Design a protein with these regions (language model features):
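Hydrophobic packing residues in well-ordered alpha-helices of helical domains and bundles
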Residues: 3, 69, 121, 148-151
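Short active-site loop/helix that positions an aromatic residue
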Residues: 145
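Small-residue-rich helix-loop
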Residues: 15-123, 163
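Non-catalytic interfacial helical region
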Residues: 1-41, 133-141, 150-166
């Protein structure tokens, strides 16, 4: 029923001709259920606006803060592991394979890692550690006390790193 209603909505919004993927995405974006894995890809792609909408959607849908944190922190840890392997002399493709990074994330990592500094990744790892405490109820100076606000700050820090790598 929901899919049928979306098709009817698309017919009303765009009555003539073939639809592009962008038109379909724009029409259904606000009703789409979000998941943490798509959030992860959007963060790694540096899509700041989309990331903010997805975080708002995940919060509204009642997603657990710790699960969202896990997804973000896992990406940060993986970036750091692959970067460390590269620093140890491993070629990027081998480091990605060894860390089980493939599919869409592989391409995103290939774009990010050559330009990401060790210091930036260390700062992100520290931020992820702080947010881990916040989503579990700890209060940290200079950080939002609300878990979702802290998650947004962490996601935007990672977005800035990935945007700089473009």
């Amino acid at each position: 029923l929901a899919a049928h209603q979306e098709i009817q909505k698309l017919a009303l919004l765009h009555p003539a001709g073939e639809l592009t993927q962008a038109q379909v995405e724009a029409a259904v974006l606000n009703v789409a259920r979000y998941d943490v894995f798509k959030l992860s890809e959007s963060v790694l792609a540096g899509q700041t606006g989309r990331v903010q909408r997805m975080l708002d959607g995940l919060q509204a849908e009642g997603e657990a803060e710790v699960l969202v944190h896990w997804a973000l922190a896992e990406d940060i840890r993986a970036l750091k592991r692959v970067k460390d392997a590269m620093n140890a002399g491993r070629p990027l493709p081998m480091a990605l394979r060894e860390n089980r990074i493939w599919g869409p994330k592989e391409r995103l990592f290939e774009r990010i890692l050559p330009k990401a500094s060790d210091a930036a990744l260390a700062r992100l790892l520290q931020s992820a550690h702080i947010v881990d405490g916040i989503v579990k109820g700890l209060k940290v100076p200079d950080w939002p006390q609300d878990g979702w606000q802290a998650l947004q700050r962490l996601a935007l820090q990672l977005c800035r790193l990935t945007s700089a790598a473009r």
